[in-house]
Every structure is written in C-alpha cells, then in structure tokens.
Amino acid sequence: MNKFMNGWVNGFIGVAIFAGSLPATRVAVMGFDPGFLTAARAAIAGILGLILILVLKEKKPAKQDWWPLAIVALGVVIGFPLFTALALQYMNAAHSIVFVSLLPLATAIFAVLRGGEKPNQFFWIFAILGSGVVFAYMFFISGDTSLGIGDFYMLMAIIFCGFGYAEGGLLSRKIGGWQVICWALILSLPFMLFLTVFYMPASFENVSTSALVGLIYVSLFSMLIGFFFWYKGLAQGGIAAISQLQLLQPLMGLAIAAALLHEHVSWSMLVVTAATLLCVAAAKKFA
C-alpha cells in the first residue's frame, strides 16, 4: 500500500474514532460543567501525551514549530471542545452533528490558506456538494429547525477545529502525527490543569457512570488516539483530500446509534450514505 492510500486508511480510522465524540460529549456534559469537561479532557490527554513523549524520549520541536503547535492547541485542544460543550447545553447530539458536515469544507479552506494546497475546481464542486447533501439530511432528521445560541457555538467550534486540523496536518509532515497532538496537549497542560482544579465539582457522588464514561472517551479517544491516525492521514494523503472523509462522520454516528441503541436505519440514510461516498471518491480523484 502506497503512502497516499495509507493516508486514506489512517484518515478513515481517525474519523471513525471521532464519530463518537459529540454523543460522548453530550452524555458527559449532563454530569459535568462545560468548563470542567473542556479542561479535564485536555488535562487527562495531556498527561498521557507527556508520559508517551518521555517514555519514547522524543526530542523537543524546533523553535519555529511552537507557534503552529499553539494554533493546534487553540483549535482542537481548547476551541472545539469548549464550544461543543457549550453548544450541547442548548441542543441534542443529533442537531450538533448537523454542523460536522461543514467541517470537511472548513478544513479544506484552511488547507488552502495555511498549507498552500491547490485542489482544482472539480474538487470544490464535489466538496460543496458532499457537505450540502449531509448538512441537508442531518438538518432534516434532527427535527429542530430553530436557530439559537447553541448554533453559534457549534459554528465557532467548526471554525476552530478546521483551523486546528489544517495546521496540525501541515506540521505532521515535519514532526509526525502523534507528536503534533502530544506536544499541543503538553503546551496547554499547565493552563488546563489549573482550569480543571478551578472548575472541579465539590463532589463526584452525583455524577452518573455514563457521564464518567463520556469523559473517558473524549479524553482518551477524541483528544488523543483519534489524532494519532487523523494527523498522520492528513500528512500522508493531503489535507484537503483527506478532510473529505469527515463527510462520513455524521453518518457513522447514526450507524453507531443503530448498532448500539438498535435505532432504525432508513432507506434514506442508505441513499445519503451512497451519495456521500460518491462525493468523497470524486473529491479524492480531483484533489
């Protein structure tokens, strides 16, 4: 398997892991304050990242790499978790997943602005078409067409995340995918530890098991392991191209719900999935 195809495989694994992020955050925020959840998930992942760096004796990034790492930290360690936690106080997970369909487009735009990538016009046609198909479908099935403060928070989350994805994918070509997220987490660790203590609830007695499981998932998988595969995939296959795999993330979320919660899988879901796969394949061809 060549480097380009490896990028698609790694990107797909990363997206599959991220697919559980919003449902897990929705469950976790029912038991934890958004500020504590944002800080704790980053602090837990940061401690694990620090241990990994020390055990493997990874050398420090070059001086010029710290600014890009700060952007990654701002985008995916702080911005996206914070704004999604705030948004999920005002909406259910299904409605929040609507906005995830805009993430591939946001990432591709930042790939052009920050990474200098130049996909051709057909790539943009299929990227916009794919985002439009998934957005329309998820907006329809969410059953909530009203707009409010939660929608603003989710839009901010997508902007921060797209920026962090593109910057991290670019830096991964130089220092490696898992190294990028580990160093970004370590960079933000002192601040996140402070916030974790500041927002820590007086007691955990009333915190449900499901909320704790949600916190563990977003800390270990969404904040750390998923990025090992995702940033490596972006570096190998191209940021704009691999970003289109995120179109599958909302549909994966529905598939997870169907498998674990025995929810009904409709024909419309299968049709939209097929259409999305075609858009991803076309974007891959023209990227």
Predicted regions and their residues:
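Helix-helix packing/entry segments at the starts of transmembrane helices
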Residues: 39-40, 81, 95-102, 167-190, ...
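Hydrophobic transmembrane alpha-helices of multi-pass small-molecule transport proteins
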Residues: 49, 70, 110, 119-140, ...
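Specific transmembrane alpha-helical segments of multi-pass solute transporters/efflux pumps
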Residues: 16-17, 21-22, 50-100, 136, ...
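Glycine-/small-residue-enriched transmembrane alpha-helix faces in small-molecule transporters
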Residues: 1-39, 143-170
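Hydrophobic/aromatic residues within transmembrane alpha-helices
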Residues: 28, 37, 41, 87, ...
